[in-house]
A protein has these predicted regions:
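N-terminal signal peptide c-region/cleavage motif recognized by signal peptidases
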Residues: 13-17
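C-terminal capping alpha-helices of c-type cytochrome domains
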Residues: 66-69, 79-98
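Sec-dependent signal peptide recognition
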Residues: 2-9
Length: 98
């Protein structure tokens, strides 16, 4: 009897957490706009982020964090994000149209 109540409570809470995650993802992704353009649509020499596969972006950000991928700025920026934040950022940009 207890398990169904826990499942029901979790089902009710799920919709409440999605908007908060969307807001957090959008806020984190906004920090990328200075170099990579609004919503990741770069107009200059920077790589566009909009539409990039989530797994690819997670991999690249982790490579910046570890120093496996050379960079001038990104290695420092990537170190400031948690795994959860990287996942949110990657999901946000993957959902954007190119």
């Amino acid at each position: 009897m207890r398990f169904p109540m826990i499942v029901a409570a979790a089902m009710v809470a799920l919709p409440l957490s999605a908007p908060a995650q969307d807001t957090a993802a959008r806020s984190l992704a906004a920090t990328c706009a200075n170099c990579h353009g609004t919503d990741g649509r770069s107009v200059g020499g920077m790589e566009p982020l909009a539409g990039m596969a989530k797994g690819e972006m997670v991999r690249k950000l982790n490579e910046f964090r570890t120093g496996a991928k050379p960079a001038t700025v990104m290695h420092q920026l990537a170190k400031g994000y948690t795994e959860q934040q990287i996942d949110l950022i990657a999901g946000y940009f993957a959902a954007q149209k190119r």
